[in-house]
Amino acid sequence: MIKQYFTQAWAQLRQQPLISAVSIAGTALAIFLIMLVVMMQQVKVAPFAPESNRDRFLHVHYMSITNKNWGGGSSNGPMGLKTARECFQSLKTPEAVTIYTCMVVSTPVNLPGQPGTGIDLLQTDDAFWHVFDFSFIAGKPYDRATFDAGQPVAVITESVARRLFQTSDAIGREFLLNHAPYKVAGVVKDVSTLATVAYGQVWVPYTSTEITKDTWSDEHMGMMSCTILARSRDDFEAIREEAERRRQEYNVILGEDGYELIYRNRPYDQEKSSIAFSANQEPDVEQHRRQRMIIFIILLIVPAINLSSMTQSRLRQRVAEI
């Protein structure tokens, strides 16, 4: 019976090859575009190493600060280290909070006497290795004592290790990072650029550089972002409430100099953070979902029209019989 169905279908396709080819191609293209849109969304929110806990992440990449002397204006961008520690690292509800630089920076690495090559550098704290699950090939991440001491150690990817030392077994070996000597503490598997928060090729403690001095607005704004790891999604609301209380308490202190921090309902979960494109605007998740649904409907109309045309064509051929 099934073989007969395929035989009939093949015979009908051969009767009108042009219409059949156009209909099949149109349907296939529509399905391909739908899959593409879905995949583009999924890579932003679906968990995968080293961001396997995306469903428990809350992010604060940027914020705003205003001053009573600015006439309603605001400064927008990443926060300073002091702000990150006072407002987020002090939270009690989350499982962990990590502070890191707001973006990777292309930085030269080389061995003494050899030409340099550019890598993507991310500066972090020791909690970073608890929040994100990297696959270590050799060695281990830097710990709290190493971080607090500001020791020049680094975790590098396998590809960087092979580029510098021609082997992934590079623990304890030294290299120059932006002309400063660093020692390899660990080697991890290469990280996809789709892991937008954890991605890097070399990770070092931010206490080993001068990045925390790159600040403005009396050190309240700077170059730092943070990610909060909740124990479960059920804690999101409690974490946001605690973060808001800390903001209000901190604003009392800042108010002595006329400053006020503005969060715009941060911290954001993974979905909301993935569509945020500026510090001074809160993304509309519902509107973004509606736009995505409209795209799906439009793309589904194409195969629906194709199938209707095929059915109508077949009916015209059988009018005499009907």
What are these regions (language model features)?
Residues 125-141, 152-283:
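Mid-to-C-terminal secondary-structure elements
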Residues 9, 24-28, 297-300:
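Residue-level signature of the transmembrane alpha-helical core
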Residues 6-18, 22, 305-322:
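Intracellular coupling helices
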Residues 37-108, 115, 222-225:
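Membrane-proximal extracellular/periplasmic loop immediately following the first transmembrane helix
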Residues 16-45:
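Short, strongly hydrophobic transmembrane alpha-helices
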Residues 100-103, 110-143, 147-148:
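The feature marks short, hydrophobic/small-residue-biased sequence motifs that occur predominantly
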Residues 282-298:
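N-terminal membrane-entry
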